[in-house]
């Protein structure tokens, strides 16, 4: 390893790439997320290692993990990266307020008909941003988006508020050939022992609630492939590798011949919430809040 070039400013883009590699545990998957080739990503991490003067990742490990020095580096570098991202997002949010633009985050199917109606009623220019399940609240807190339509239960971060829009039943997405696929409704015990999708990046409490874990029967929930979005989850379901419990509106949002959505009759309903920053008094956000409140009151 070359001697660290201490006078060189730390490249936060390279730090961000390192965090993706660690999260994925694999250069190829991380490269796919970053829209670069695996060799190019490996060179980026080498460049960062040369800059700090130590090896940060153990490339011989499967999955790829941080070295001891990498653990120390990431612990200190992650807050700096998050601070820089928040600073840039704050400037972007200020510019959007001035231009009366609104950036709204969503996970596929989360907004439902009420959310779509609220968006359609706005006078502000709207940009929609698709979020991973793990980003539903954090994207609002960091000002990556101005608001988001989310699916609780979610951890409430400081400065972020949730407003209930509506509630609806939950359904289970099953591969078309599943023994329960032709039913109009089932009880949760009928899928006890069936493998459920997981999501490593999402809050564990959120994953468990949506999987109805623990089950009333006491049967342990079996978790399978980890996914980040509903699109990924449904691909896993279609391939027969797991099932996913989700909101009834997902069945309206996705029409697929290889998947059946069946209502679960004996579990708690789910909600749709609007997530915004508590102190955000921009005209576009206020307009969105009012639209959501009015539509919710009409139901």
Q: Which role does the model predict for each range below?
A:
Residues 51-52, 73-101:
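Alpha-helical linker/hinge and terminal dimerization helices associated
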Residues 162-170, 174-196, 286:
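Flexible hinge/capping segments at coil-to-helix
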């Amino acid at each position: 390893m070359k001697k660290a070039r201490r006078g060189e400013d730390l490249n936060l883009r390279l730090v961000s790439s390192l965090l993706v590699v660690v999260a994925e545990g694999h250069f190829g998957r991380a490269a796919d997320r970053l829209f670069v080739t695996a060799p190019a990503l490996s060179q980026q991490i080498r460049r960062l290692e040369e800059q700090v003067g130590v090896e940060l990742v153990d490339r011989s490990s499967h999955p790829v993990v941080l070295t001891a020095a990498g653990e120390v580096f990431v612990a200190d570098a992650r807050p700096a990266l998050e601070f820089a991202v928040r600073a840039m997002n704050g400037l972007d949010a200020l510019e959007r307020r001035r231009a009366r633009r609104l950036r709204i985050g969503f996970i596929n199917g989360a907004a439902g008909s009420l959310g779509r109606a609220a968006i359609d009623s706005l006078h502000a220019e709207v940009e929609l941003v698709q979020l991973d399940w793990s980003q539903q609240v954090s994207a609002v807190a960091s000002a990556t988006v101005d608001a988001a339509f989310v699916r609780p239960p979610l951890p409430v971060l400081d400065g972020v508020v949730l407003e209930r829009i509506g509630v609806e039943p939950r359904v289970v997405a099953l591969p078309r050939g599943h023994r329960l696929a032709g039913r109009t409704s089932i009880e949760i015990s009928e899928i006890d022992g069936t493998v459920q999708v997981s999501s490593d990046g999402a809050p564990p409490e959120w994953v468990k609630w949506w999987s109805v874990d623990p089950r009333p029967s006491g049967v342990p929930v079996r978790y399978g492939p980890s996914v980040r979005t509903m699109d990924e989850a449904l691909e896993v379901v279609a391939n027969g590798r797991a099932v996913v419990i989700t909101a009834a509106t997902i069945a309206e949002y996705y029409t697929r011949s290889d998947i059946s959505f069946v209502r679960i009759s004996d579990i708690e309903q789910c909600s749709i919430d609007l997530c915004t920053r508590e102190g955000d008094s921009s005209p576009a956000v206020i307009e969105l809040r009012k639209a959501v409140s009015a539509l919710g009151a009409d139901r």
